Amino acid sequence: MEQMSVTQFAGELKMPASVLLEQLQKAGVEKTGADQLLTEQDKARLLEYLRRSHGQSQPKGKITLTRKQTSEIRATDSSGRARTVQVEVRKKRVFMKRDEVSAETGSLESAQIEEETAGLPMGEIEPTPEPENIVEPVAEAIPEPEPVREPEPEPEPIVEPEPEPEPEPEPEPQPEPEPRPEPEPATVESGAPAKPEAPVRAPSRPPLRVSILSDEERAAREREARRHQELRARQAADLKAKQDREAAARAAAEARRAEEEARVRAEAERRAEAAKPQPKEAAKAPAGTLHRPAKTEEKPAGKDAKRTARGDTAGESAKRRGLKTRGEVGATTGSWRGARGGGRRGAQDEHKSFQAPTEPVVREIHVPETISVADLAHKMSVKAAEVIKILMKMGSMVTINQVLDQETAMILVEEMGHKAFAAKLDDPDTYLESAEAHHDAAVEPRAPVVTVMGHVDHGKTSLLDYIRRAKVASGEAGGITQHIGAYHVETPRGMLTFLDTPGHEAFTAMRARGAKATDIVILVVAADDGVMPQTREAIHHAKAANVPLVVAVNKIDKPDANPDRVKQELVAEGVLPEEYGGDVMFINVSAKTGVGIDSLLEAVLLQAEVLELTAPVDSPAKGLIIEARLDKGRGPVASLLVLSGTLRKGDVMLVGATFGRIRAMLDENGKAIDHAGPSIPVEVLGLSDVPAAGDEAIALADEKKAREIALFRQGKYREVKLAKQQAAKLESMFEQMAEGEVKTLPLIIKADVQGSQEALVQALNKLSTDEVRVNAIHSAVGAISESDVNLAQASGAVIIGFNTRADAGARKLAETFGVDIRYYNIIYDAVDEVKAALSGMLAPERRENVIGLVEVRQVFKVPKVGTVAGCYVLEGVVKRGSQVRVLRNHVVIHNGELESLKRFKDDVKEVKFGFECGLSIRNFNDVQEGDQLEVFEIQEIARTL
């Protein structure tokens, strides 16, 4: 072996060289310098000294080896995903000397036997004090020379940590006692090499072994084994008794719970029997089925016993394998993972041991306006497949995501045995109702809202122009009103608010909105024209709204004016003047000259005084959207008539499915205002989208609540719209299958305001017939955009712009794609052109036109040609290729076509009246003399709507 210096050895031991030199000198090794070399004997002496000083003079009796092995396995977790788990296996092996093994298996009696052998020589007994480490009494009983060594541990407590690693590596490479394998083959490396006492220890063991295996020791071992066996048996008996007690307690608890449930059910059945006396036998049945819980008494106990036994076996096998586990992971409480299989079943059995026959559960289902099949199934707690089956039996083929309307859903719920209610449980509109109930502001008189109605061209706008001293009518396209206008006028007797409605038949919805918001209706009738269709419609609107009428007979300055005839016609419509005993005032006026205008205003104000119109002023505003449009620069603009309260700039408004904070308010002249009271018409800016004309507007204090209600309404309208579209698609599909293909004219309609848009769509849809149909793919308010052109190109539609124009990008795109864009300012022109286009799509009418009559004089049979008839033209003309009808005795026997026409031997195109000719009929040879041939042509005549 290589020798090393004191400095090198100190470096290995991680200690100063000076300290090591001191320890070497105390151990009897004469080393004075750090560069001197150390031999193996010097190291052994130092080791022996250190052991003596720390009370470990004797060699180690046992060696412990620990081995750690790490590996990886792939396992699935509770969610089913594969995971890599690191497994660390630690093995610990203890090697002991044979005499130590025998000493450990013995009890305290073995120590006494060793005391008896104390007469042996001291050198033989001295090497065997190993039992000292295990049994303390032996060390006290033998007066060994250990007390002499005890005073030596005083020096260097500092060195105590350093020499600890030294003894461990030292004993293993030196298995010096080679002569010993014969007496002790089981002994592995001894713990004390290089000791002079080691050879003396070998002969001392056989006599010691003989003394240990004596009869007394054997008897002592048997007694100890019996005692351990009795102890284990007693512990097993206690454990079994405890398990039996727990199982019996559980079984008793189950039985008590089952009896209690049976008693409660029997009581319920008895009460039900008292309420309806028919099912008497059924009520007795639960009381008689008390044998069922009795059966379940032993069942849990048996299962628990089996489970316990299984758990014990599993635990023992796990211990035998020596694997480190997380412990019991069965169905015990507090375990980190639920039990697999049986554990969960056991837990369920404890709770569900008793089940009485259940009656079908009848639920109260609140059905909204629209609901999907899946949501409805969830409400009824059934699978969606069951709902689809019932719907298929009812004749509807649906999918799980299909939306059902309220009526169908309620029928389905009743069909499945539940109770259906039409409900709006989560409707935030209830917030508005509760908010209205809390506002009890003082009411004040307000100005009347007057709507001017009548037939087109009867002078409504001209009448208002004279009252307002304005010239609106002269600036309107075509001289007709196509928008609803709102104006307020100050008169000496008070303020009046006028609504001017269109008179054209297409604007029915506008007139209905005007009647809804009004207090008084002025019915304008031209004295030279009388009562017309829209006049009658205006009367109906006024009566439906329960609004008083004032009739203005206009154009009395014309020569052919006849006010009395107008009165008679209105009486026929149920409008009685005051002079006839009615309650309607008739005023003769002329919007051109101003005759009777003051009398008309006085009559209106008188009627308003009778009505005593009032409205709260200091409260949140409520109003009605008269008209709405999309302005390119300002966004959505809504014309609003305030009905009650005061509307201020900055208020949060909720209008139908739109909301927003008012950024600006304008009066009818375009001037900015800050607030508007009752009966004042204003234009508001700041809404999130273009509202629908006729929607009710309300001012709210909470913008968050306004947004919530608007979004709810949007979702509701969308669901209803989708449900209607789906139904319409199915209906139209069946219609097309039944009637054949219907030609459609796809249109995209863009208008300046909402009212014009809906009026135009309605007027164009009225043009549809069974053969041709107008399909308004998209209709909206605003300018024609590129998205409209793209949609038109994809669907092959024509774009109609009513009082709007296409922007530059849209025009360029339309030229590229060849999309047709038509602009109109007058609704008549738009309707007429679409009508003409639909007429062109109609299949032409086929009409027969008889052009001649010929008589067969002679018949010739020509080979390879067939029958040729020699004829005389009695009337008209005969043309080659014309259709002919063969008449025999004035009865039609054949319809066909002329194949050839000849005069003498020449082919001719036609033969006129009074000439003879020869002809043959295609695929017909049964021509006889005396037959007459009627020659005709089929003309196609274009149809109109």
Curated annotation (Swiss-Prot):
Transmembrane segments: none annotated. Keywords: Cytoplasm, GTP-binding, Initiation factor, Nucleotide-binding, Protein biosynthesis. Residues 215-283, 294-310 have a biased composition (Basic and acidic residues). Residues 454-461 are annotated as: G1. Residues 479-483 are annotated as: G2. Residues 153-175 have a biased composition (Acidic residues). Residues 52-80, 96-357 are annotated as: Disordered. It is found in: Cytoplasm. Residues 590-592 are annotated as: G5. Pfam families: EF-G_D2, GTP_EFTU, GTP_EFTU_D2, IF-2, IF2_assoc, IF2_N. GTP binds at residues 454-461, 500-504, 554-557. CDD domains: IF2_eIF5B, IF2_mtIF2_II, mtIF2_IVc. Residues 554-557 are annotated as: G4. Signal peptide: none annotated. The keyword GTP-binding applies. NCBIfam families: IF-2, small_GTP. One of the essential components for the initiation of protein synthesis. Protects formylmethionyl-tRNA from spontaneous hydrolysis and promotes its binding to the 30S ribosomal subunits. Also involved in the hydrolysis of GTP during the formation of the 70S ribosomal complex. Belongs to the TRAFAC class translation factor GTPase superfamily. Classic translation factor GTPase family. IF-2 subfamily. This is Translation initiation factor IF-2. It comes from Aromatoleum aromaticum (strain DSM 19018 / LMG 30748 / EbN1) (Azoarcus sp. (strain EbN1)). The gene is infB.
